[in-house]
Amino acid sequence: MQWETVIGLEVHVQLATKTKIFSGASTAFGAEPNTQACAIDLALPGTLPTPNAEAFRFATMFGLAVNAEIGKRSVFERKNYFYPDLPKGYQTTQLAEPIVGAGYVDLELEGGRTKRVRIHHAHLEEDAGKSLHEDFAGMSGIDLNRAGTPLIEVVTEPDMRSAEEAVAFAKKLHSIVTSLEICDGDMSQGSMRFDVNISVRPKGQEKFGTRTETKNLNSFKFMEEAIALEVERQIDVLEDGGKIIQETRLYNGDTKKARSMRSKEDSNDYRYFPCPDLLPVILDDDYIDAVRQQMPELPDARQARFIGQYALSSYDAGQLSADKLVAAFFEQTAQLSQDAKLSANWVLGELAAHLNKTEQRISNSTVTPELLAGLIARIKDGTLSSKIAKLVFEAICNGEGDADSIIDTRGLKQVSDTGALEKMIDEVIAKNPQQVDNYRNADDSKRPKMLGFFVGQVMKASQGQANPQALNELLLKKLNT
């Protein structure tokens, strides 16, 4: 039997406000436990929440960015459940009247395919605290610094049919919120967390299967692995005649295994009701229009501009525009070097590989746009071959200086002098008379491949510094006479 995977996501986006959603306590990451929790966060008697206006502005920006309806009237509700890191015994969130209504995000997938993922809604809520288990023998600690941090929870429709589509959506959402600067996007610090709802059904069946939820995935890689594992598990259970239990599961990225946490609750289990301490929030058209005017360039608009302004392919433009900092680095390099195509190739190729290898972000890279533009200039004027340019780039990464100083210090200037090249070519021809005869007696169709032998010999003699274009022209001239 052929099976179809059905995936929906719930994404928790931590908003980059300086203070919490209902209190003035700081949201800065990394402070000592319980040093950034005030009386409101601790749920002390007599305290009342005060909504954070910046959180509403950020949520409105997000809604506009995902083509959604903005809720002009939104209501906070209490989601009731007990957990040690939830001091109040309930979470203040939104359900019936969220700030962001139905919207959508368009994806570009491999092979030129496109996919529209519908967003059911997005709502504002407060984050819970954090339970600490590792540093306490036989006990657990509670850190309430995170309690009350503002979140947007984005809930999609079950529109995704593979791990590839789910990861593509997650990456697009990450690109949107970081471009808007409403979230720093640092998943290692919990700034974005993904809950994945997964079910399978026989291909062609309209009715959804029983879903499970895998919670708190904090990387694209873990999301892909967790989906593949859960899909395989569900198919095995069904093909063995079993039934899928609606449950919440937890994936361990170290062991590559998942386990059941608890049975999955429905909304009725949380006994939602309107929060009596908070009035409905009313947003008018003037407010929404003012927020729209403040919005920065979004990834899709940036991609379209890169295609038109720099004549880049849709793929290259998409890769460069996904990250706001990468896009800015590319544009500065392109303007300094006056060569957008070479700039794109180097940013997406050698620079991306270097950042990945050294686990650096482009914002603190040792390679600057000025240094990369200087290297590109030496490629354009023929000073460096593409092969030698990579050696110079490695030296730049190691902090040895700019391209010009490295070329001078190491003597890496490309050999374009006709006299010097002819001398090396003559020596190679003289040393290889049999290969010369074979080349001259060969069919035209075989000659290009045979020419590679002579190119390689001259490159070896020049230590890779011969100008490839000049070398090929001179070799053809000498071998064909």
UniProtKB/Swiss-Prot annotation:
Subunit structure and binding partners: Heterotrimer of A, B and C subunits.
Originating species: Cellvibrio japonicus (strain Ueda107) (Pseudomonas fluorescens subsp. cellulosa)
UniProt-listed Enzyme Commission number(s): 6.3.5.-
Function statement: Allows the formation of correctly charged Asn-tRNA(Asn) or Gln-tRNA(Gln) through the transamidation of misacylated Asp-tRNA(Asn) or Glu-tRNA(Gln) in organisms which lack either or both of asparaginyl-tRNA or glutaminyl-tRNA synthetases. The reaction takes place in the presence of glutamine and ATP through an activated phospho-Asp-tRNA(Asn) or phospho-Glu-tRNA(Gln).
This protein's UniProt keywords: ATP-binding, Ligase, Nucleotide-binding, Protein biosynthesis
EC top class, as a word: ligase
Gene3D superfamilies: 1.10.10.410, GatB domain, N-terminal subdomain
Family under the similarity heading: Belongs to the GatB/GatE family. GatB subfamily.
Protein name: Aspartyl/glutamyl-tRNA(Asn/Gln) amidotransferase subunit B
Record bears the keyword Transmembrane helix: no
Reactions accelerated catalytically: L-glutamyl-tRNA(Gln) + L-glutamine + ATP + H2O = L-glutaminyl-tRNA(Gln) + L-glutamate + ADP + phosphate + H(+); L-aspartyl-tRNA(Asn) + L-glutamine + ATP + H2O = L-asparaginyl-tRNA(Asn) + L-glutamate + ADP + phosphate + 2 H(+)
PROSITE patterns per UniProt: GATB
InterPro entries according to UniProt: Asn/Gln-tRNA_amidoTrfase_suB/E (IPR017959), Asn/Gln-tRNA_Trfase_suB/E_cat (IPR006075), Asn/Gln_amidotransferase (IPR018027), Asn/Gln_tRNA_amidoTrase-B-like (IPR003789), GatB (IPR004413), GatB_C_1 (IPR042114), GatB_Yqey_C_2 (IPR023168), Gln-tRNA_amidoTrfase_suB_CS (IPR017958)
Record lineage: Bacteria, Pseudomonadati, Pseudomonadota, Gammaproteobacteria, Cellvibrionales
A biological process from GO: translation
Molecular function, one GO term: asparaginyl-tRNA synthase (glutamine-hydrolyzing) activity
